[in-house]
Amino acid sequence: MNVQMKGNELITKLLHEWYQTMLQQHVSKATNLKQEIEDKLSDIKKEESLSLYYSLLDFRYKVLTDGLSITKDSFNEINSFDVPNNSFLSYYYHFFKAIHATLTTNYTEANEHFEKAEKLLMYVPDELEKAEFYYRFCIFLYHFYQPIESIQYATKAKEIFTNNEGYELRIGLCDNMLGASCVYLKQFEQAEEKYNSAIDTFQKFNEKELVLSVRNNLGWLYASQNLSTLAIRHLSEVTEKKPSHFKAIFLQAREHHKLGEINITSELIEKGLIICTEIGNTEYTHHFTILKALNNNAPAEELEKIILEGITYFDKETLYNYTQEYAEKLATKFFKESNHIKASQYFNKGLEAREKTFEKGALK
């Protein structure tokens, strides 16, 4: 009995150590520890709580090593467990569930689990865990189109990481998120400054994958200013080195579309649709499908059907910024076809969506 307890304590300690390396963004060290832990998998499976803890951290490892490959099914194994109430495991369950929902673009669900996780943070009384929570929540807020709140949480996370040795990569990741929110706020100079700071940090540690994630964001920064050629230069580097990076593929396709390069745009759209179908990413499936219709110069009525399907999803997830963007594109299309009643209808829908975006970001 005592031997088993000691063995469980050692495994628990090893699992804690594994998670700490993930918090530090140390991929190679985390991979080595994963292999060491997998040698003890038969012992881990004997204990329900250890098995749940391992499954949670295994999901977190997948987020660390290839977050873009996370699908709706990636949490199935964890969902098969009975999750205890009011413990560090219940915190990790809701926290990681929120991360999973964010990555799979189920933002309403993500919000619910972030709220539950925040109430359980007391069971993990670690300052660095708070920083990790703030960082992940800032990503959610960014995707949820609340850039000011995202900046607040990214700043809180960065402050804690800065005060602890060995978290330089996390500081770089915070700078990356600060830059992203600055783009939403059209503070382009500040965004570029934050992105360059993040790249400097990642290059210092030879973190090529992280540099690529910032290159993607730089592409978006330049795309937001209609600097299509410059945007494509950064985005093509990402899509060449990470062919499954569907977000970079979409941004690159959209910039080629702006330049009237129909064939290149079409090729990228088909690649993106295949990837998004495989991983079940609903949001980007809509983005690619709408861009495909625009690239094919679909008639207004056909475009209307496709955009309305997207708007139904965007409204459900309260992504009103996209509802506004696509309603305005549809209004412009109807206007060009001299259908002024429909044009007026969709310009008005875009205006309503803009108001909802403003209300969502307003002080509560």
Regions found by a protein language model. Give the residues of each.
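Alpha-solenoid helical repeat architecture
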Residues: K6-L10, K46-S51, N85-Y92, P125-E132, ...
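Long, mid-chain structured domain cores
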Residues: D58-I160
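Loop-centered beta-sheet repeat module
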Residues: I151-L221
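Tandem amphipathic alpha-helical repeat scaffolds
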Residues: L14-Q24, S55-D66, Y91-N106, E132-Y145, ...
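Flexible inter-repeat linkers and adjacent short helices
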Residues: M1-K97, I269, I306-E309, F314-E317, ...
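Amphipathic alpha-helical segments of tetratricopeptide repeats
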Residues: Q35-S42, F75-V83, E115-D126, T155-G166, ...
